[in-house]
Amino acid sequence: MAFRAICVLVGVFICSICVRGSSQPQARVYLTFDELRETKTSEYFSLSHQQLDYRILLMDEDQDRIYVGSKDHILSLNINNISQEPLSVFWPASTIKVEECKMAGKDPTHGCGNFVRVIQTFNRTHLYVCGSGAFSPVCTYLNRGRRSEDQVFMIDSKCESGKGRCSFNPNVNTVSVMINEELFSGMYIDFMGTDAAIFRSLTKRNAVRTDQHNSKWLSEPMFVDAHVIPDGTDPNDAKVYFFFKERLTDNNRSTKQIHSMIARICPNDTGGQRSLVNKWTTFLKARLVCSVTDEDGPETHFDELEDVFLLETDNPRTTLVYGIFTTSSSVFKGSAVCVYHLSDIQTVFNGPFAHKEGPNHQLISYQGRIPYPRPGTCPGGAFTPNMRTTKDFPDDVVTFIRNHPLMYNSIYPIHRRPLIVRIGTDYKYTKIAVDRVNAADGRYHVLFLGTDRGTVQKVVVLPTNSSASGELILEELEVFKNHVPITTMKISSKKQQLYVSSNEGVSQVSLHRCHIYGTACADCCLARDPYCAWDGHSCSRFYPTGKRRSRRQDVRHGNPLTQCRGFNLKAYRNAAEIVQYGVRNNSTFLECAPKSPQASIKWLLQKDKDRRKEVKLNERIIATSQGLLIRSVQDSDQGLYHCIATENSFKQTIAKINFKVLDSEMVAVVTDKWSPWTWAGSVRALPFHPKDILGAFSHSEMQLINQYCKDTRQQQQLGEEPQKMRGDYGKLKALINSRKSRNRRNQLPES
């Protein structure tokens, strides 16, 4: 029974190894929430044990504050240490609104509260904040003081309606930007959640919105993000870009499919004079594509945009747009990261317009005359210096925009394929942040990818020989105790910190923790983390301005042979030899766990002084990610096993195991609970002398016996009663006699 139980446990262990050892790339280092806290590179904040739906809505590096919205609370956290006592404002929905919300059948816990969804900088002293208000949106001004030292954080004005500024439903995302004390929002404007709009409010000018109930403009959108992006050198040509996904009817007009989109408008758009009054006259949109083309032709689309990050440069046209996409298919679960050049996006918006033609309303490129100024052009910009407002636009320009808001060409990622693809994993990506890092051998982009399981993956983008780029997962961190989806993520390159939120709270994580890779130069070099380098003593933070000659870093190739000469590399590559015993016809496991799952493992066997030969794998001998399983040990398995790990052409011996095979009968007798070995204090009861027993076994077998005796002595020291003399000596006596005769045959003459 004991042997059967062991077999079952080994089987479960192997199954778990097989599940973990999928074809998907794995992180070099995985840290649980508690392990991450032990590194002292993270902080955590939560108001209570309740789920309050935290959202990081604004980061102010000048005042060293992080502004967080949650259910009934507005929080101001210290950007250097979020676990310090926060400044907070309790801002619940009115009792009447909460009761009305419940009467309407809304969720009392996750709907009938004031979920803060908008926090924008209004001026030097005030923030503008909006909440769902128990399905009755409300906004107000919050005084934060001129300096962070003022410790001022309070609402000092009356609340006003948030309609057109914040969605009624807290589970429907609201996106916003503030420009010159004007709020641009993407949200749903009604209680029922049927009227979506991109809205300009909080303005001394007239309020402007998208054309109402016009599916050509917006069709059941789910807003993701919004950004102000320059377009040329003239500030009047800047655009507000809205990223969203929407349900569009296919050509058969029978089903709706989800597509990711980008829309843009001019901030100085005041609407049309006779048509599109108080509606955008510069609204255009284009489809955002993230797909993988199979070898046989068809495309697998990642249709649902989840998050966007803009990696800005000194030249706005070279800005990169990173997007997280997921599949809308119910067949498989997948995520992808696609990267776009801003210049490619702007080229599509300057390209042909889409036009529906024919009985099937097929989309084609519009071939008619394009009115002047080109639809989508901002008034007062480089191309329209004489037009002060959009009310000066000719009627044909406004009419064209109303009927042709969609661009014909779609926006494709760099190299027309995703940078990262994950299919068949137990997680999906939800959020992204990107940092640009200067290393010894170049500049690298490091991606921080939040998942729906409460982890953050740190991924470095590596150049390859082809036109595409490779990627390597450096770390995966559990930033929350429970596996809850990550809702927002902000990065501060200045502070070298990442800020992450979920339903449960907010976490702060350093962008690097170099010491976790290991204590040797080779470990540090193989990690290929652009934040880290070997300084001659440890793996530590790399500073490009440093002039220390002992700094060792090779992100591009990760080759310790060229970087770690003189740092005890030879000793590092050899492992100490250990002895392990196995029992004939039983199972055994030779453990060999490489420091990195990115290393490949090969087993070599050396018998006596013969050359090492690679272990042949079969149904009896199985290699796993954690070691070598021998399902039925044979005498031929005895020898010295070498576990060789290879990573980036660098080989090292992870384990040396001198494996010795024991006789099953001897082990059964020695380990039997009724064995005479348990009667160490009752020698007189034995029908033969103990020396006869000791002489019956080989040196290696005696090592096992000595260990058994040691365990017995420890039991006696703990005060346990010695077991009574019982058992059958016949089997033991026969074994002793056979061993005696064998030992006499093999005994060397005394010298």
UniProtKB/Swiss-Prot annotation:
Disulfide bonds join C101-C112, C130-C139, C266-C378, C290-C338, C514-C532, C643-C709. GO terms for biological process: axon guidance; blood vessel remodeling; cardiac endothelial to mesenchymal transition; cardiac right ventricle morphogenesis; dichotomous subdivision of terminal units involved in salivary gland branching; heart development; limb bud formation; neural crest cell migration. Residues 28-511 form the Sema domain. Its main location: secreted. Disruption phenotype: Perinatal lethality. Mice display severe defects in cardiovascular development, including aortic arch malformations and septation defects in the cardiac outflow tract. GO terms for molecular function: semaphorin receptor binding. CDD domains: Ig_Sema3, Sema_3C. InterPro entries: Ig-like_dom, Ig-like_dom_sf, Ig-like_fold, Ig_I-set, Ig_sub, Ig_sub2, PSI, Semap_dom. Keywords: Developmental protein, Differentiation, Disulfide bond, Glycoprotein, Immunoglobulin domain, Neurogenesis, Secreted, Signal. Interacts with PLXND1. This is Semaphorin-3C.
